[in-house]
Amino acid sequence: MALALPVAAQKEASVTLKVNDAKEKINKEIYGQFAEHLGTCIYGGLWVGPDSKIPNTQGYRNDVLQALKDIKVPVMRWPGGCFADEYHWMDGIGPKESRPRMVNNNWGGTVEDNSFGTHEFLNLCELLGCEPYVSMNVGSGSVEEAAKWVEYMTAADGPMAKLRKQNGREKPWKVYYIGVGNESWGCGGNMRPEYYSDLYRRYQTYCREYSGNTLYKVASGATDYDYDWTATLMDRCKDFMKGLSLHYYTCYTWSGSKGSATEFNDDQYYWAIAKCGVGVEEVLRKQIAVMDEYDPQGKIDLLLDEWGTWWDKEPGSIEGHLRQQNSMRDAMVAAYSLNTFHQYTKRLKMCNIAQIANVLQSMVLTKDDKMLLTPTYYVFKMYVPNMEAVNIPLTVKCDYFDAENEQKNSARRVAPFVSCSASKMADGTVNINLANADLKNATKVTIDLGSIRGRVQNAQILTSKNVADHNTFEQPNTVKPAAFSGAKIANGSLVVDMPKTSIVCLQIK
């Protein structure tokens, strides 16, 4: 049944597609995922072990595996995050009963048994058909440890290859993405950029390429508005890296309450939309400008390898496990963010939402043998056709709202009620992605299609009665996509009648 919700007070917006300017491909890695040893992201989320009563394949939850296959996960980052700089990979190989236990000092002091290690992660990537992105331990590890890890994973012969074969894996894995440290300005060592730059150059030297495997080396980059860190690394390391990371969270404060995931007022909602829309666009634009200064040829990519919402933990959950619910507000954050990412793919190579299961803005939530799909998951599923399509630049004219700016001494953010992106697939199909963030008003969006011809197909809408609505194990289908009939083409324009707080994706072919 197609859904065309009633339109009460209706605003108007217009979009102009610049079809002739379409040339930059939307890298599928923009839709990357992040799995850290944090709370129940790995243990209970992805992994239950082969002896579990929960249906599994080689220890991986079948329900989660299928959910991730359905959104075509292109790349997965592991083992962290802050965890990466305390992780010693050799503790996570060999017979599981012989692996030493460890305390996860960063995240709640949980004691882990190391049953999920290198083999388990890389085999998971093979099952999903995605690229692994492995973060090396620079904070508490050694150059030798990092070098041997790369050799263990990718060499066909030699002492580390022999050890890998003894542990049951004859053929080396293909590992392309290597992160040299994580948040080295913070939990990864509280380093100065000058010091980390020297460490990066040293570590990457000994991460060698074996047996035809190519390494894409990523330096630990800045957080948010730290442009000096980016400038220092670009100045000192540009000849030694393929990519530079960046972290940006929709988080109100790093001290004190971050606000509830499901109980918030209108001002808090609009702050989040402005933070993920205008805020992330500003950071990407300014960080890329710094990179352009040192690398005008665009040889070095930017990787936003941590992003998403960060609210207070779910009531009753364990401190430090960062388990949070996921509402229609989070779905709107995802849509606004992805629409923005599409505009920067000339430099933006990869984005990894935090995190894949049970942590922060997750795709799925699990509890014992139950699993539910979050509103954010559905946005990722609706946006799948954009992977590897060519971004179509566009302009949007609509009403704006102003919201608080959490940066001190900064003006309030002014953000659009309507966010849009468009892309063209190899077969000529055009994807249109729209989000109406207005809490009170429907919006009639008129899109000038230019030379595009075809019919509206596969139109879907994600919306709910209340923007705080979310899926629970008791009611897992409160927020889910439905077929949408409120779009039509007339006189060279696509007209979409968007309900309030809704996300619409459709195709023209």
Model-assigned labels for residue ranges:
Residues 4-6:
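N-terminal signal peptide c-region/cleavage motif recognized by signal peptidases
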Residues 8-243, 277-281, 285-313, 317-509:
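Non-catalytic accessory regions flanking glycosidase/transglycosidase catalytic cores in CAZymes
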Residues 246:
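Histidine-centered catalytic micro-motifs
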Residues 249-271, 317:
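Active-site His/acidic residue clusters
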